Amino acid sequence: VANLMELADAAGFGTGIVTTSSVTDASPASFMAHIEYRYCDTPDAMERENIRMPQDSTSCGQDRVANGGLGSVVEQVATSKMDIVLGGGSDKFTVTVDGDPSTTVREQAKFNGYTVIQHLADLDRLPAENRVLGLFSSGHLPVRSRGVNGAKAEYIDRVGDKVVWPEPFACEANPEFIGMPTLAAMTKAAIGRLNSDAGFMLMVEAASIDKE
């Protein structure tokens, strides 16, 4: 079954993904990949014993390139026809492709016509022709603010008939966010890259809310 981006591409539209998560995370992956299980995001995670949640009986062995499948999520991102993909997850692209230990997934993306960018300033000079793959952090993009003294958000608790609220805490600027693109900056760059009379489909995800 074709996904929405494949249908848009077939209709002549430009296609793009912008996310503050890894570009291999579940939401962006659903627009770019066909896979049995969301955690089969790299070639070495395709078999049940290597999957992040081994208690699940699901395996993606049948999706491996070596078995005639389309490959892991990251391999499918690298071989996709997307015009622009911006987010995090650069570490996923350092692994080698299934069946070819001499080629990394990042190199595979370049072979497929992607220009890989990594820095905020690169958004101001996107190539006019090549596909663009922006990988601005090793995993999910850092959030803009963090709790003072390492404070983390806590769940609301319930004791009997009473709701127990966690203690509020102050936030401060997150130094890890320095040099990172905002969701707005990535979205603006993607629209600028895709804008044409043919039209485009762009999926934009503010993913950080469920990563903290």
Which residue ranges define each predicted feature?
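Membrane-embedded translocation segments of transport machinery
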Residues: A170-A173, A189-R193, K211-E212
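Short acidic, glycine-rich surface-loop motifs adjacent to enzyme active sites
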Residues: D197-E212
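A structural signal for short secondary-structure junctions
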Residues: P127, N195-S196
